[in-house]
Amino acid sequence: MRIQTERFGVLDVPDEAVIRFPQGIPGFPQEKAFVLLPCAEADAFAFLQSIMTPPLAFLLVTPFAFFPDYNAPIHIEQVRHIGIDENNLGEIWTIVTVPDNYHDMTTNLLAPLVINRKKGEAAQVVLEKTNYTTKHRLYPASASTEANGKGGG
């Protein structure tokens, strides 16, 4: 399949690489088909590119690269419809927000994406009874301050 993207131009994507979100993504219910594109600069990052909407691409991160103790209490019932079970736990990614200063990037640990590549389906799951929020910093605040030239010294 050939898709047009704003960020990456025209891409040839094998049909088996398409990841479907049967229930859409909150805020984007009409967007149900994406492709996961690795970020060449950093293994922990990838882009989730919409098949239908060329400008729509989410930056994702594997949360364990920045939060090794991340424990997403996902109930199998929340993701069974995409083929996740005790024998196939899938992959966990989180959506990143990138402000003007990339040192201020945050990720949404409260609502991870669970991807079942074997089945080509995924879901965004909102965690319950957790202290995670939608805005966890990827880099310490001191990195942002130094990048802006406001560090003490």
Curated annotation (Swiss-Prot):
Disulfide bonds: none annotated. Keywords: Bacterial flagellum biogenesis, Chaperone, Cytoplasm, Translation regulation. Coiled coil: none annotated. It is found in: Cytoplasm. Acts as an anti-CsrA protein, binds CsrA and prevents it from repressing translation of its target genes, one of which is flagellin. Binds to flagellin and participates in the assembly of the flagellum. SUPFAM superfamilies: BH3618-like (SSF141457). Its main location: cytoplasm. Interacts with translational regulator CsrA and flagellin(s). GO terms for biological process: bacterial-type flagellum assembly; regulation of translation. The gene is fliW. This is Flagellar assembly factor FliW. The keyword Chaperone applies. It comes from Heliobacterium modesticaldum (strain ATCC 51547 / Ice1). GO terms for cellular component: cytoplasm. InterPro entries: Flagellar_assembly_factor_FliW (IPR003775), Flagellar_assmbl_FliW_dom_sf (IPR024046). Belongs to the FliW family. The keyword Cytoplasm applies.
